[in-house]
């Protein structure tokens, strides 16, 4: 089973406006139209069995609509959607509990889109509440190519975030995922500060520019059992990502873990 753990889909009317805007901002060519149907089609072509959709709440007032759409996505075959919350949310404990009650497996946060540093107390509160409810947390990490001016989740701050969330008691099974290899375009800092910590890294988008040797070194430093295949579709091509992982100088068992076994273990109760 192949699971793409980092994808995006928008309501049809919103996708037609949002995808061209973000594509122009980051100077990338999208691989789908940004709709759920477009995402499902891309996954089928690539041979992906399940796509995990990660929404972003860019202002507190979007909480209800974003999470309602996430719940609708979870009714579609082959899609598992996280929920979202903004750090300025007026009632973080209640809304995290609501996400859990909706049956969503976790929460996506995006420090660059939300304009808050990852080690801010508001994100600490969100993460602690999420973990209390058994939810996963996925955060954008490193440079955002569309908004490169300020990096809100560099590896050094990510470490401070972890230390405050876990308070020295890291769980046996990781429940926090740092996207883009732990820090987009910051692999040296990731290896120095984050590699080896009890967290997952996903591989979203980085195969589009990073060479195989650097990514293999990162995987070796962190451990294949804590690496998740991800394309960032529509910004990355899942088929290209699968080919990239299969080309790495890793064992077949390590490639199997990355492409799906790790995520299958994480999301077992959400997979029919």
Where are these regions (language model features)?
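Active-site environment of divalent metal-dependent phosphoester hydrolases
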Residues: 10-13, 58-61, 88-91, 114, ...
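Mobile, glycine- and charge-enriched loop segments
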Residues: 1-31, 67-84, 191, 196-200
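Conserved, mostly hydrophobic/aromatic
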Residues: 6, 43, 70, 99, ...
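Mid-to-C-terminal alpha-helical segments outside catalytic/metal-binding sites
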Residues: 1-8, 14-50, 221-228, 239-272
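A cross-domain feature marking catalytic cores of carbohydrate-active enzymes
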Residues: 7-9, 55, 83-87, 109-111, ...
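Active-site gating/metal-coordination segments in enzymes
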Residues: 49-50, 60-145, 209
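Catalytic pocket-lining loop regions of alpha/beta-barrel enzymes
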Residues: 105-106, 120-228
């Amino acid at each position: 089973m192949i699971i793409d753990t980092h994808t995006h889909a928008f309501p049809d009317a919103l996708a037609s406006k949002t995808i061209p805007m973000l594509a122009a901002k980051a100077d990338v060519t999208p691989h789908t139209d940004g709709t759920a149907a477009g995402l499902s089609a891309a996954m089928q072509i690539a041979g992906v069995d399940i796509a995990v959709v990660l929404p972003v709440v860019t202002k507190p007032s979007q909480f209800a609509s974003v999470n309602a759409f996430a719940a609708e996505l979870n009714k579609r075959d082959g899609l598992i959607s996280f929920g979202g919350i903004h750090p300025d949310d007026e009632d973080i404990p209640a809304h995290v509990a609501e996400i859990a009650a909706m049956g969503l497996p976790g929460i996506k946060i995006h420090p660059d889109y939300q304009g808050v540093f990852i080690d801010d107390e508001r994100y600490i509160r969100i993460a602690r509440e999420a973990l209390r409810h058994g939810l996963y947390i996925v955060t954008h990490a490193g440079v955002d190519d569309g908004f490169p001016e300020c990096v809100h989740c560099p590896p050094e701050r990510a470490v401070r975030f972890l230390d405050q969330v876990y308070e020295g008691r890291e769980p046996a099974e990781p429940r926090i995922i740092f996207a883009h290899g732990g820090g987009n375009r910051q692999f040296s800092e990731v290896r120095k500060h984050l590699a080896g910590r009890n967290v997952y890294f996903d591989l979203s988008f980085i195969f589009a520019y990073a060479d195989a040797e650097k990514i293999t070194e990162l995987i070796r430093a962190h451990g294949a059992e804590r690496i998740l295949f991800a394309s960032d579709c529509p910004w990355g091509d899942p088929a290209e990502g699968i080919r990239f992982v299969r080309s790495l100088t890793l064992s077949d068992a390590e490639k199997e873990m990355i492409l799906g076994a790790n995520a299958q273990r994480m999301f077992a109760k959400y997979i029919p």
